[in-house]
A protein has these predicted regions:
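A beta-strand edge to alpha-helix "cap/lid" segment located at domain peripheries
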Residues: 2-21, 25-118
Length: 118
């Protein structure tokens, strides 16, 4: 898969943009209908939880240690470290992106709080 690192880095960055995180319409363009997230808070989120009354916080984020594993021609795993500069919290992140109808959608995401700099 050509340019996989750049493609999925950009998709993760879009997912983290405040204008996307605060728009149910924009989130619906990224999240798969069967999306599931195990949040860093320990809460489980599903796509149906994101509606006009619930959007994500518009925090300032920085991605590092970004890695892509191509699982198949239509499925990719991304892993990275995320620094939330607003909340001053570090997390380890993993996402599974699936390609459906020629569009990549976020199917699964997990955040795990860490104090480790590795």
């Amino acid at each position: 898969m050509e340019n996989a690192i750049q493609t999925f880095y950009e998709l993760e960055c879009i997912h983290l943009k405040s204008e996307v995180r605060t728009s149910a319409e924009e989130l619906s363009n990224i999240l798969a209908d069967d999306y599931v997230e195990f949040g860093s808070s320990g809460r489980v989120w599903k796509r149906k939880n994101y509606n006009n009354n619930h959007v994500l916080s518009p925090d300032v984020f920085e991605i590092s240690h970004f890695h892509v594993d191509v699982l198949s021609s239509d499925c990719v795993l991304t892993t990275y470290h995320l620094m939330n500069h607003t909340a001053e919290k570090k997390t380890l992140r993993s996402s599974i992106w699936r390609k459906r109808e020629e569009k990549w959608r976020l199917f699964f995401h997990q955040g795990t709080v860490t104090n480790d700099d590795q």
